[in-house]
Amino acid sequence: MLKIYGSDLCPDCIRCKADLDAARVSYEYLSITEDLRSMKEFLKIREESAAFYAAKENGSIGIPCLISPEGEVSLSWEQYL
């Protein structure tokens, strides 16, 4: 199942969830601002994945972060619509 690390404080995360819901895409949403375990998991992924290079360079957090069932990391949800 698709996993999404995000926060309901983030407009992009809210839009991501709305778009995926409208497209009836199943996913597990992990809030990094409501659950420290999810925050720790996200930070580990962020440190290890090249997908975050541009986000780090721009000073962005890098959410929503999507993890495919195959383990691929992406910061773009449009590919799942």
Language-model segments: which ranges?
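Structural micro-motif
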Residues: 51-67
